[in-house]
Amino acid sequence: MNSKLSLSTKLSSSGKTQLAEYFATPPFKVITLPSYDDAWANGLNAMQMSSSPGVLAGDLLEIDISLAKLTALSLNTQAFTRVQAMNEGDSAMQTTHILLAENSRLFYLPHPLVLHRDSVFKQQTQIEMGEQSELIYGEIVAIGRVLNDERFAFRQFSSHLKIYALQNDGKKRPLVSDCIQWLPSKMNLTALSQMENYSHQGSLTYLNLAKNNAEIKQQVQALQQQSTEEKDLLIGISQLNEYGLMVRVLGCRAEANSEII
C-alpha cells in the first residue's frame, strides 16, 4: 500500500500554532490535542495515528512535515509500529521529509518500531533547518518480540538520517549524517559495540541553531552526569560538531528507553 501523510503549520493572529494544511491517506491520521502548559504553550500538540495492524510487505510510507516561521509542533504517535513478517524478497519502505522554517521548533518521537520475524524495513529521513530553529527528533527500535524468541529474527533493518542547515544562498550545509544497517544473517549484532545483550536501541538528536558550542557543551555535561544514575541502560551522549548533541541508549525495555529519551 502507498500511504502519505502531509502536514504544515501556520501562526494564528493570537500567536498560537495551528495546522495550515493536512492531508492523509489510510492508514494515516492526525489529531490535535490540548497544548502543554509550559514553554510550548503556544505550540501545537498533535498525535500521529494509524489504523493498520502494522507495516506490511510492499508498503511505501511517505511523511512530509513543514513548519512555518515562529511555529512549534510536538508530534507523538499512538502506538508501537510493528513491521510484520514478509516473504523472501519483499520489503517495506518509509521516507520522511521535514522542513523547519526560521525560529520554528519541532519535537518528534514516534513509539518504538518492532521488527517481527522475516521482516525487512528501510527508512530514510531528511530534515532541513532554517536559522535559529530547534529540533528534538528520536527513534526507538526493538530487535524483535523477545518473549516469542524473536531476537534478530528479522532479515534487514536500515535507517538513514540526514540533517541540513539552510543557508541564505539557498544551499544546504550538512549537520548530521547517521546510518544504522542491521543484517542479522551477515553481522554479529550481539558483539561488543553492537547491541550486545540488549533488545532496544534508542536514538535522540537535539539541534538548536540559536546555541553556540559552549552552551551545547554545558547540556552534554549535565546529561552525562544524569546518565550515571541509570543502572539498567547503556547510554552514550556526544556533542555534534556544531549546534547540537546526540544520545544513544541501549536497554531491555521499551518503556525505559522512552522515558530516558
From Swiss-Prot:
Pfam families: UreD. It is found in: Cytoplasm. Keywords: Chaperone, Cytoplasm, Nickel insertion. GO terms for molecular function: nickel cation binding. Coiled coil: none annotated. One of its GO terms (cellular component) is cytoplasm. Its main location: cytoplasm. InterPro entries: UreD (IPR002669). UreD, UreF and UreG form a complex that acts as a GTP-hydrolysis-dependent molecular chaperone, activating the urease apoprotein by helping to assemble the nickel containing metallocenter of UreC. The UreE protein probably delivers the nickel. Belongs to the UreD family. Required for maturation of urease via the functional incorporation of the urease nickel metallocenter. PANTHER family: UREASE ACCESSORY PROTEIN D. This is Urease accessory protein UreD. The lineage of its organism: Bacteria, Pseudomonadati, Pseudomonadota, Gammaproteobacteria, Pasteurellales. The gene is ureD.
